[in-house]
C-alpha cells in the first residue's frame, strides 16, 4: 500500500494555490514517484493499493504501471461528518471533494483477491483526521483481501504485522482503539462471512 506525497499543479505548471496553502509536507514530482524501484521490493505476485487524489487519477494509473502493476479496480473513501453526512471541507477546482480513491492493481500469476475480497464492497465511510491522514479501516480490509507480507510506503505510523517505510513512521503512535469507536468501514450485511484463511 502506498500514499505518495502528490504534487498538485495548475495549467501553468505551478502548484495550485488551494493546495499550496494546505501543503504541510514535502511533495514529489510524478517522475520521481514513478522512478521508485517498487517492482524490485515486492513479490513476483502482489497486490498494490495506491492512494490517489481525484484530480490526479491519470497520474495514478501511470505510477501503478511504472511500478509493474496492472490496474483492476478501485476503492472509494467517503469522508463523512459525525452525523454521517458528507464532509464538505475538502478542496477542489471543479467540485468540492468528499472522496479519495485507492487504485487496486495486481502483478504476477494467480493474483486474484482472497475469498473475503469477493464479498467486500469497494467503499469506506469514515471521518477525516489530521491533514492527509488516511482511514484505519484500510488495514483490516487489505489484510482480509490480500495475502501478506504487507508493506506500507510513505507510512505515518507503525502497524503490527506490517513493514512500514516513511519519514514519519517512527514519530507517531496511532490510537487505534479510540479511533475505532467512531469510524467504521461500510459493509453490506451478510449472513455468512467467508473464512479469512480461504485461498484465492
Predicted regions and their residues:
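Class I S-adenosyl-L-methionine-dependent methyltransferase catalytic core
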Residues: 1-200
